[in-house]
Swiss-Prot record:
GO cellular component: endoplasmic reticulum; Golgi lumen; Golgi membrane; trans-Golgi network
Protein's recorded name: Protein-tyrosine sulfotransferase 2
Tissue occurrence: Widely expressed.
Transmembrane regions listed in the UniProt entry: 9-25
Keyword entries, A-Z: Disulfide bond, Glycoprotein, Golgi apparatus, Membrane, Signal-anchor, Transferase, Transmembrane, Transmembrane helix
Similarity remark: Belongs to the protein sulfotransferase family.
Glycan-linked positions: 342, 367
Entry EC no(s): 2.8.2.20
Residue spans, topological domain Cytoplasmic: 1-8
EC main group: transferase
SS bond list: 95-155, 224-232
Marked site positions, Transition state stabilizer: 157, 284
Organism of provenance: Mus musculus
Residues annotated as catalytic: 98 (proton donor/acceptor)
């Protein structure tokens, strides 16, 4: 027993001596750097400023802050999942499922900035805006790059990230933003009927949800306009559904990505290598396995309480600002392309395939509920 105690003490002494030796060596090196005038105490440069990933095709992909990231967002239930599935169908693009963590981290960063006391504490501790921004930049890029397969163009779809478009544009100056815009009445009806839990939204009240929708889209739209139309494109869900080819050509031109017919048939690439990866827990998965169709456009009509319909222009003034008629029930969104009419007939007849990895899931989970930060 005594021998083992001696061994422990000896080992601890050796470890302490080693730590002290390392610290002393570091101090000597720092002193030399200061004397040589080469040390900058305020900046550190990482050895590797890029993330390097190897794809299944054995192609090396390099990602950095200067790369043209794509951010897809909007109020939940506005078509963000459809948009990212269409982009995922492009051979050069990978979006993947919602990370859920990125909007939360952005919200924390915003909260620190808004709190004067917390900002002072961070500054006093040396955790300046420059330090925080560098950390946020590295974290967000790491999550986007590594939560899915590598691709030439990376995109992120977390609905609420576009509440921070201005900040993200500063972190990633070559990024582009797609703001999904949908008739708020349709978005809210979808939230309520599909029980999509979103923080702050009372799913028992159309009036409350429309008020919260108005506030959220107002913030996102203002951020989009501030970033500028050369960097942020509002995409109307109704027009994307009615005229997919025309809409997608405009979107890909905006993003600087070559056209590919695969974006018109995202449903054929679900679950396939290099295709569209879907999450079993996102509420829109059972919808985006279908071809683009008219099924969800006007489902909300006749379901909103009369008093809310009467006060719609006051409850949700952003409807009119975005070009929707707050008094039209149902509104006329336009005439669909022939391919969309054909797709709708197929969907109504059940003439579409459920991916093998999702078979049986929808029947088991159709009526289940789970907390969501927001999906669409």
């Amino acid at each position: 027993m005594r021998l083992s105690v001696r061994k422990v003490l000896l080992a601890a002494g050796c470890a302490l001596a080693l730590v002290l030796a390392v610290q002393l060596g570091q101090q000597v090196l720092e002193c030399r750097a200061v004397l040589g005038g080469t040390r900058n105490p305020r900046r550190m440069r990482p050895e590797q400023e890029e993330l390097v990933m190897l794809g299944a095709d054995h192609v090396e992909y390099r990602y950095g802050k200067a790369m043209p990231l794509i951010f897809v967002g909007g109020v939940p239930r506005s078509g963000t999942t459809l948009m990212r599935a269409m982009l995922d169908a492009h051979p050069e693009v990978r979006c993947g499922e919602e990370t859920r963590i990125i909007p939360r981290v952005l919200a924390m960063r915003q909260a620190w900035t808004k709190s004067g006391r917390e900002k002072l504490r961070l500054d006093e501790a040396g955790v300046t805006d420059e330090v925080l921004d560098a950390a946020m930049q590295a974290f967000i890029l790491e999550v986007i790059a590594k939560h899915g397969e590598p691709a030439r163009v990376l995109c992120n779809k977390d609905p609420f990230t576009l509440k921070s478009s201005v900040y993200l544009a500063r972190l990633f100056p070559n990024s582009k933003f797609l703001l999904m815009v949908r008739d708020g009445r349709a978005s809210v009806h979808s939230m309520i009927t599909r029980k999509v839990t979103i923080a702050g939204f009372d799913l028992s009240s159309y009036r409350d949800c429309l008020t919260k929708w108005n506030k959220a889209i107002e913030v996102m739209y203002a951020q989009c306009m501030e970033v500028g139309r050369d960097k942020c494109l509002p995409v109307y869900y109704e027009q994307l559904v009615l005229h997919p080819r025309r809409s997608l050509k405009r979107i890909l031109d905006f993003l600087g990505i070559a056209w590919s017919d695969t974006v018109l048939h995202h449903e054929d690439l679900i679950g396939k290598p290099g295709g569209v990866s879907l999450s079993k827990i996102e509420r829109s998965t059972d919808q985006v396995i279908k071809p683009v169709n008219l099924e969800a456009l006007s489902k909300w009509t006749g379901h909103i309480p009369r008093d809310v319909v009467r006060d719609m222009a006051q409850i949700a003034p952003m409807l009119a600002r975005l070009g929707y008629d707050p008094y039209a029930n149902p509104p006329n969104y336009g005439n669909p392309d022939p391919i969309v009419i054909n797709n709708t007939h197929r969907v109504l007849k059940g003439d579409y395939k459920t991916p093998a990895n999702l078979k049986g899931y929808f029947q088991v989970n159709q009526n289940s509920t789970s907390p969501h930060l927001g999906s669409s």
